[in-house]
Design a protein with these regions (language model features):
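FAD-binding core of flavoproteins
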Residues: 1-87, 97, 190-207
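C-terminal helix-coil-helix/basic helical segment that borders enzyme active sites and/or dimer interfaces
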Residues: 86-100, 113-146, 159-164
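Conserved catalytic-core motifs characterized by acidic clusters
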Residues: 46-63, 88-102, 126, 160-176
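Alpha-helix capping/hinge segments and adjacent helical runs
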Residues: 28, 134, 141-207
């Protein structure tokens, strides 16, 4: 009886099913977060997706692909944040020198570029395997985990390099920073991704 979940397709207007306004989200403000309420909602067999008690399999058919999608969008935003940080470090001067020449800033930029490249390679490899049909859950989890955490780091460091100006809404950095937070939660939290990765590592050893 473990993990017995069934997936259903619920039509709007089904008796007992209500959609109402949700909460305002800090991240991704361009869409609505709606609340789905079920009150004695009964559904016919025809609205079962897949097989009864096989809801996890249904979710698995699209969850891996969406994790790669999340990883890819995170790479784009991380690249944009790094671009702003580089431009500002080359333009802004303190004590008669560009701040990008100061070790405290230059090391940040190097780490940001290195982590972005690592996340990109993980994501590209997972996408390549996905197209070939050889991708594993761990491949997709590694890509999602690395890309989301790299985006968070780069967004934070880009703001740090800009100082107080980085938090102003005249620049896109504060939005990238806000949006980065939810990426480590949806499509499986960072903790879930680590669980999936370690589970695949231990499985051949019988653990």
């Amino acid at each position: 009886k473990k993990k017995r979940i069934t997936a259903f397709l619920v039509d709007k207007g089904t008796p007992g099913f209500t959609v109402r306004d949700g909460y305002r989200n800090v991240s991704h403000r361009g869409y609505n977060n709606m609340i789905l309420e079920f009150d004695d909602c009964r559904l016919p067999k025809s609205q079962v997706l897949g097989e009864v008690h096989k809801g996890f399999e249904v979710a698995g058919t699209w969850l891996g692909a969406t994790r790669l999608q999340v990883a890819s969008t995170c790479l784009g935003r991380a690249e944009r944040a790094l671009g702003h940080a580089l431009a500002y470090a080359a333009e802004r001067k303190q004590f008669g020198s560009q701040i990008g020449k100061f070790q405290g800033i230059s090391f940040k930029l190097a780490d940001m570029a290195m982590e972005l490249k690592a996340a990109e390679l993980l994501t590209r490899e997972a996408a390549w395997k996905y197209d070939k049909g050889t991708v594993t859950e761990a491949d997709m989890s590694m890509a999602k985990l690395k890309a989301t955490e790299v985006l968070a780091m780069i967004a934070d460091e880009a703001i740090q390099i800009h100082g107080g100006m980085g938090l102003m809404d005249e620049l896109p950095l504060e939005r990238i920073w806000r949006d980065a937070r939810v990426e480590r939660i949806w499509e499986g939290t960072s903790e879930i991704q680590r669980h999936i990765i370690s589970r695949e590592l231990l499985r051949p050893l019988g653990a």
